[in-house]
Amino acid sequence: NTLYTAEAHEEGAEIRIVSPLDGKETDFYITLQGIDSKSYRTAVRAYHRKLIAEEEGGEVDLLVAITKGWRGLKNNGKDVVFASEAAHDLYVNAPSVTSQIDQFVSDRTNFIKG
């Protein structure tokens, strides 16, 4: 059924990150799950619980939860291996990356093939 999008969103899609310095595409790609995925919906519930409890960090935790992996991220010339902790650190310290992710994830067409 062409209306069923949850599976494609769960599988994920890749965003190519743009440099905040010059606006050019980088060689850094992040694989994310979309807003129709079960993972995203579960993470949103956790985000809402934190919001109600007036706890910090809910937005970053949400992004970490829907990040499946990455490739091409380097630090001092060495590859940075994907891990939840590394993603958390990136998202806290690179607001330009998180805003690109927010825009990408909210566009359902990024997750639909064809």
Regions found by a protein language model. Give the residues of each.
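Residue-level detector of well-ordered alpha-helical segments, enriched
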Residues: G58-L63, Q100
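Structural motif
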Residues: L51-E59, Y91-S96
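Residues that form generic nucleotide/phosphate-binding pockets
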Residues: A43-A46, K50, A65-I66, D89-L90, ...
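C-terminal charged interaction modules
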Residues: N76-G114
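Bulky hydrophobic/aromatic packing residues
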Residues: E14-V18, W70, P95
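Secondary-structure edge/capping motif, primarily at the C-terminal ends of alpha-helices
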Residues: K50-L51, G77
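Short, charged/polar N-terminal "headpieces" of proteins
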Residues: N1-K50, F111-G114
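Mid-chain, well-packed structural core segment of small domains
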Residues: L62-D79
